[in-house]
Amino acid sequence: MYITQMRIKNYRNFKDLFMTFHPLANYLVGENDIGKSSFLRLISFVTRARNVDEIEYDDPHQPIRIDLEVQLLEGAKEHFADTPDDHRRAIRVRLEMRVSDIVPRLYDLDTGEELPLETIRRLRYVSYSALSQEDAEVRPQVYRALERRLAQWEASHCGPIPQDERCYIQHEVNVGTFDSSYYECIFYLSRILCRSNRHRADNLKFISLAALRVITQIYQMANSLAVPLEHNIIVDKDGKRYLPLIISIDEPEIHLHPYMQRSILEYYQQLLRNEDASFCALLKDLFGLDGLRGQLFVVTHSTDSLIDDYRNIVRLYRDHQGQVKAACGSSFHVKREIEKHLIMHFPEVKEALYARSVILVEGETEFGCFQLFGQTVGVPFDYYGICLINARGESSIAKIKKLLEYFRLPVVALYDADVKEAHAKEKGVYFTQGICFEQDLAQTMLQKGKRQALDKIIDAACGTTGRTSSDMLKKACHKLQLDPQDFPPGPLYKAKAHNGAPLWVPYFAWLYSNKGVILGRLIGQSLEKQEVPPAFAKVIHEAGRLATV
């Protein structure tokens, strides 16, 4: 079971927000205070079929309307345990809340018929946030009951907890805020779920904690009279019983380092995909369940948490009217060949999902100097929210630009002028004045009378006096369609203009043959505002303008 799409009207800053979702995992990204955590809170209200507080209404005089499309069952022979004759695979409903109502009303979107709220309560929602203490909200009696059940199960499989571990549990009780049963549950689960690929204590501790949180919620559902568990259980054609769950995790980066963030999020997905055999066996023995079916929602401001697939991303952004909208990776329709490139390049552009505008450059030297150029020309990238991406070649710029534009990100791309004919009609594209970045730099520095400064940069980059070789000059002259015989090799500071040959060519030859991030940083640190080539400054200022729109 999973939510396929949702339309939200009049909830907080969501005047009219449409979203589509991936069936397995969805990562919500975007700027601060745009409504990502508010969305998770709304899911809680929807799945419990409860009204929100008056302060949650954008306009209290109008209702909040949430249109949902939910995939209930996977096949025509499946059914819910309490309605064996109902085989509806999907529903389209509207949940309508009014300030004056105690509970919301539920309608069938296709017929307009009012439905019982039990229909939407088939969705069960479990939320975790690093900023709140869900564990502390669970009554100690629940942990004690689980401790007894886990102890019986574990004793028949692994044996009792050793004395040294019991001493550690008592220490945690003395210094912590939980009953001893809470810590014993974690230790029991750590032994039950232990595998060869979970040898590190911290890995196992957090994985056990994740499992305990899920089991605790299922235990409370199983013992609840408000919504009987049978109302939620799906029975497949083979008689196997599955509990559908929607799990949300808010800001996992707060207490976890990057590797642990990814490990824990992947483990939650494994639980929802029933890939942990020990956990499935535990569900079977404790609750008579053969597994889970679920959907994961993650709100994060960390690129370390993000999955490397654009199809799992939901980016919230503001349109030109200031309204919150969503760009959903699951709804992008692209050809298979393009999709392959989008997935391949996505790891390089994850940080851009949090940006206000993006600059794409072709190579490493540009990448090394542009952020420093931004400081120099008065457009600091971090302050403006500008993301700089190295496309690692002209051919990748268009593909990365397309992906970013799918996510409604303003993009400025800088190409070398030698490919101008192929890209001149594209939107948001700029070109160097000379044939490439290195020519612009060499010409600008010499025109500004900064030859000595350029010599200093080159000498610092190579650790000795910069000089050109015959190979450098041949390569450069081939690019420029000049005769290398007009440019004898040697130290750059001795280079002279003769026979009408321009002086910037030897400098271009050296720069063209020594591209790299370190050189780029030296250039960025050394140039004054008036020395930044105009084509580069123009791109930076345009990115700054887009970031403030």
Label every model-predicted segment:
Residues 58-61, 118-121, 227, 237-241, ...:
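Conserved catalytic network of the ASCE P-loop NTPase/AAA+ motor domain
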Residues 345-360, 364-549:
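Acidic, Mg2+-coordinating catalytic modules of nucleic-acid enzymes
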Residues 29, 38-87:
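Conserved P-loop NTP-binding catalytic core
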